[in-house]
Amino acid sequence: MDKKTSRLRRATRARKKIQELGVNRLVVHRTPRHIYAQVINPEAQVLAAASTVEKAVKELLKSTGNVDAAKAVGKFVAERAIEKGVTSVAFDRSGFKYHGRVAALADAAREAGLKF
């Protein structure tokens, strides 16, 4: 089993557990160059999203693949979710380690007002 398959298996296992809870989830996807975050409801509808690909976020950053970029995305997605009335979510790290950029995004979202 390769690295990607292992990550996807972990992600599927976590998503099934979150699905049983029936709560909104903050999903994170990470690539070497960018980071993406979405708040998704139990019916699989995207309520809020932010990424380093967006012009509004990219203009604030020197680089899109570092911890500072992840913090900016976490702040933006939390603000947009709160505007839609979502204050509590489950954190779905998509099988990535809770470390570095993923942890920075989560911390920034918490500081901006999301609870998880």
Curated annotation (Swiss-Prot):
Transmembrane segments: none annotated. Keywords: Ribonucleoprotein, Ribosomal protein, RNA-binding, rRNA-binding. InterPro entries: Ribosomal_uL18_bac-type (IPR004389), Ribosomal_uL18_bac/euk (IPR005484). One of its GO terms (cellular component) is cytosolic large ribosomal subunit. GO terms for molecular function: 5S rRNA binding; structural constituent of ribosome. The keyword Transmembrane does not apply. It comes from the Bacteria. One of its GO terms (biological process) is translation. It holds the Pfam family Ribosomal_L18p. Belongs to the universal ribosomal protein uL18 family. Part of the 50S ribosomal subunit; part of the 5S rRNA/L5/L18/L25 subcomplex. Contacts the 5S and 23S rRNAs. HAMAP family: Ribosomal_uL18_B. This is one of the proteins that bind and probably mediate the attachment of the 5S RNA into the large ribosomal subunit, where it forms part of the central protuberance. This is Large ribosomal subunit protein uL18. The lineage of its organism: Bacteria, Pseudomonadati, Pseudomonadota, Gammaproteobacteria, Alteromonadales. The gene is rplR.
